[in-house]
Amino acid sequence: MTAVLPLPQPLADPAPRDPRQRLQREQLRLGKRLQRQVGQAIADFGMIAPGDKIMVCLSGGKDSYTLLDMLLQLQRKAPVPFSLVAVNLDQKQPDFPAHVLPAYLRGLGVPFAIVEQDTYSVVSRVIPAGKTMCSLCSRLRRGALYAYAQTHGVTKIALGHHRDDIVATFFMNLFHHARLAAMAPKLRSDDGAHVVIRPLAYVREADIAAYAQARQFPIIPCNLCGSQENLQRQQVGKLLQQWDRESPGRVEQIARALGDVRPEQLADRTLFDFLALGRSGDAPSGLDPDPRAWLSAGHATHDSD
């Protein structure tokens, strides 16, 4: 008689993964992605040189906290030595928790300075109630930070602008100023004395927000300009968020396009010599009519018109 073997029992479902462990792994992957993107931006634009003293402008927002955190992590394994100093500008805003940043930075063991300058009173006095304060506030803030950098041997000034800031600035310039311009990942400061770098240039704002939440940074809200509604940047930001929801990857494509400019396919005569295009190499340039003659011809009228 042939033995009847018992049917194999179905394998039990694996035990559900611990949600805390899964969250930790996701946060670890996020941190590594941000480090990789920051390192790539630094390499692509030559942001950091050996011996640089980098001033990290720390506002107390998620972006600047993430910037400092990334640079501290990269500093430990960077191919070149550089130093960091975190600098916060105390603008004397009402109810500003002045103790938060010093306590946080002391806990990290990071060299830091608090620059006190009452820009709040200046802005409040000059700007009418209900008007946007961001532009004037930004200029005053830059002046104070540049002055500190000048007197303390700073060679690079690191700002926390991210990919979405850069794309938003592009559209603000396009919509409101009729020019194609954004934020450069690296540029000369307004006073001409320093180089400004934006190591978060490749990082999405959503990733920064998630990272800041995971790291539990002590976020300080901006009560001066960040809470004002209907600002141009907020409007553009909402547009970008809508695009990300409806067409994932569109904002990333726009960001990449900022690094692939084709002057010959635009209309800026200072970037491309349209007058020389199509001109015979043997034809003397003196035979070309004065461009102003075409303008005069365009204005000419006849009795039959």
Swiss-Prot record:
Catalytic activity: cytidine(32) in tRNA + S-sulfanyl-L-cysteinyl-[cysteine desulfurase] + AH2 + ATP = 2-thiocytidine(32) in tRNA + L-cysteinyl-[cysteine desulfurase] + A + AMP + diphosphate + H(+)
Record-linked Pfam families: ATP_bind_3 (PF01171)
Pathway annotation from the record: tRNA modification
GO biological process: tRNA thio-modification
Motif (PP-loop motif): 59-64
Cofactor annotation: Mg(2+); [4Fe-4S] cluster
GO MF, one annotated term: sulfurtransferase activity
E.C. number(s) listed in UniProt: 2.8.1.-
SUPFAM superfamilies: Adenine nucleotide alpha hydrolases-like
Keywords from the named record: 4Fe-4S, ATP-binding, Cytoplasm, Iron, Iron-sulfur, Magnesium, Metal-binding, Nucleotide-binding, RNA-binding, Transferase, tRNA processing, tRNA-binding
Cofactor note: Binds 1 [4Fe-4S] cluster per subunit. The cluster is chelated by three Cys residues, the fourth Fe has a free coordination site that may bind a sulfur atom transferred from the persulfide of IscS.
Leftover remarks: The thiolation reaction likely consists of two steps: a first activation step by ATP to form an adenylated intermediate of the target base of tRNA, and a second nucleophilic substitution step of the sulfur (S) atom supplied by the hydrosulfide attached to the Fe-S cluster.
Assembly and oligomerization: Homodimer.
The protein, known as: tRNA-cytidine(32) 2-sulfurtransferase
Record gene name: ttcA
